[in-house]
């Protein structure tokens, strides 16, 4: 999802990963509010409804990109949009983001209507709405994802197919690779993962659909656009994407990436466990100890000064930091590996 918040003038306590994630979810909820109460594939959907849905859809962005300019005003009919959705439904179903696919499976199993029990599910739900497959009823704890029976029935047949499963294995492999890359670098040009994914898919039933690969990236990861208009995937905890604008296409083979991720995990795990043990039962009600420690680790990766790290820690607690906490934080601040993308972008 496009990064919504501008953090450049904020203090570090206001731009932790937890805070930025909450702002992303609030923006997502705002996007979903005010949409038509009908999905494109429901009988009551009108052409006026279809036009409103189109404006939020991936189709609108793709059409603007192809034309290279603002689109001429035109009413998109229900029939036209339904045909566009169904034309690539088989391929798109296989190329959903991991979180979208999880929601799709649940929706199919439960007859096209599921509660969004976790606020974090709003982002993949919004992506499914942008694909014009679903709608979301209600907000907050009462939010429900609704998928028309026509699409549920079609998806049910696809989910059981061997070709679908084969593509999903590739999708999950690429998803994990991108997540590891973002944790290592902080950001990555989308062109590299897109090329890699296309090469893995070239002999499958979904070959030749670069627009669906782009949708997968937009739906599955936080992103911004660099100064040249290129898609830049960013870690959800990266507070200032501008610092990464100079990052080049850094591609690592899966084996090297796996080894680097394992090495970082071996280094960070003891730091994480030590700090977590000290924060149990002393974090503010709105944040878990696990999220608090993760916030601190991600800040350390961005070379946040020790003084600011201590202020952030204080803001997360219901008490003053103890000497043990300060010592653990100093150790974490000194030893957590910095994001390679920060140093890479500085030399451009």
Question: Language model features by range: what are they?
Answer:
Residues 2-95, 100-110, 115-133, 139-141:
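Basic helix-extension-helix modules of the SAP/HeH family
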Residues 54-61, 192-202:
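DNA-recognition alpha helix
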Residues 66-87, 135-166, 226-246:
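Accessory beta->alpha helical hairpin/"wing" motif in late/C-terminal subdomains of nucleic-acid enzymes
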Residues 77, 122-135, 200-231, 305-340:
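Charge-enriched amphipathic alpha-helical scaffolds
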Residues 110-115, 183-192, 285-287, 302-306:
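Short capping segments at the starts of secondary-structure elements
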Residues 150-184, 239-264:
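Short, amphipathic alpha-helical interaction segments positioned at domain boundaries
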Residues 180-184, 188, 202-205:
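N-terminal membrane-targeting/insertion segments
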Residues 200, 204-311:
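Long, charge-rich C-terminal accessory regions
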């Amino acid at each position: 999802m496009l990064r919504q918040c501008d953090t450049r003038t904020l203090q570090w306590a206001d731009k932790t990963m937890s805070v930025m994630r909450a702002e992303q979810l609030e923006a997502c909820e705002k996007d979903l509010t005010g949409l038509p109460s009908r999905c494109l594939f429901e009988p009551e959907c009108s052409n006026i409804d279809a036009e409103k849905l189109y404006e939020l859809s991936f189709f609108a962005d793709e059409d603007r990109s192809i034309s290279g300019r603002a689109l001429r005003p035109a009413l998109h009919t229900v029939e036209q949009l339904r045909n566009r959705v169904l034309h690539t439904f088989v391929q798109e179903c296989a190329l959903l983001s991991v979180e979208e696919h999880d929601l799709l499976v649940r929706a199919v199993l439960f007859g096209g209507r599921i509660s969004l029990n976790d606020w974090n599910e709003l982002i993949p739900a919004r992506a499914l709405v942008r694909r014009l497959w679903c709608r979301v009823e209600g907000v907050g704890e009462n939010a429900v994802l609704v998928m028309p029976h026509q699409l549920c029935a079609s998806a049910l047949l696809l989910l059981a197919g061997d070709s679908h499963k084969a593509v999903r294995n590739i999708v999950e492999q690429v998803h994990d690779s991108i997540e590891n890359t973002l944790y290592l670098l902080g950001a990555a040009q989308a062109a590299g993962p897109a090329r890699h994914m296309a090469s893995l898919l070239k002999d499958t039933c979904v070959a030749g659909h670069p627009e669906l690969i782009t949708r997968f990236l937009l739906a599955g990861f936080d992103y911004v656009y660099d100064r040249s208009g290129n898609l830049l995937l960013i870690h959800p905890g990266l507070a200032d994407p501008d610092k990464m604008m100079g990052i080049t296409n850094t591609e690592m083979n899966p084996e090297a990436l796996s080894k680097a991720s394992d090495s970082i995990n071996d280094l960070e795990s003891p730091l994480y466990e030590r700090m977590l043990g000290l924060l149990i039962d002393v974090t503010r009600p709105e944040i878990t100890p696990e999220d608090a420690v993760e916030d601190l680790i991600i800040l350390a990766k961005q070379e946040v000064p020790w003084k600011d790290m201590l202020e952030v820690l204080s803001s997360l607690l219901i008490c003053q930091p103890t000497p043990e906490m300060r010592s653990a934080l100093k150790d974490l601040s000194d030893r957590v590996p910095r994001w390679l993308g920060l140093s890479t972008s500085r030399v451009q």
